[in-house]
Amino acid sequence: MPTLNQLIRHGREEKRRTDRTRASDQCPQKQGVRPRVPTRTPKKPNSAPRKIAKVRLANRHDIFPHIPGEGHNSQEHSMVLIRGGRVKDSPGVKSHCIRGVKDLLGIPDRRRGRSKYGAEKPKSI
């Protein structure tokens, strides 16, 4: 514990907060190219492989966003749009790919929660 004299001479150093959105430059969405197509296994109680993408953003940051929904058409060197939002059981995955934008297609024949997965409105009978 510092003495009063030491505090007068030096003061207290403020804690620096870590920036969780460093890769996105405080932007709501960011565009990137996908150089690799890996999958990851989640943390302990869960076991299904999670579909993720290694994406190089326009500002040269490499991030690992999650691809939501069942199945995807994403390949190497396809353009994707990234938004925030982490995946709780996958360490290091702090963003999501946006379906139905750029080269990542939406989910066909999806009826509910369509806006989250880039699905078109079904034709009424």
Curated annotation (Swiss-Prot):
Family: Belongs to the universal ribosomal protein uS12 family.
Region (Disordered): 1-51
Primary residence: mitochondrion
Biological source species: Panax ginseng (Korean ginseng)
Location in or out of the cell: Mitochondrion
Keyword set includes Magnesium: no
Entry GO CC: mitochondrion; small ribosomal subunit
UniProt name for this protein: Small ribosomal subunit protein uS12m
Keywords: Mitochondrion, Ribonucleoprotein, Ribosomal protein
Name of the encoding gene: RPS12
Annotated Pfam families: Ribosom_S12_S23
SUPFAM superfamilies: Nucleic acid-binding proteins (SSF50249)
A biological process from GO: translation
UniProt keyword Electron transport present: no
GO terms of molecular function: structural constituent of ribosome
Role according to the record: Protein S12 is involved in the translation initiation step.
Classification via InterPro entries: NA-bd_OB-fold, Ribosomal_uS12, Ribosomal_uS12_bac
Compositional bias ranges of the Basic and acidic residues kind: 10-23
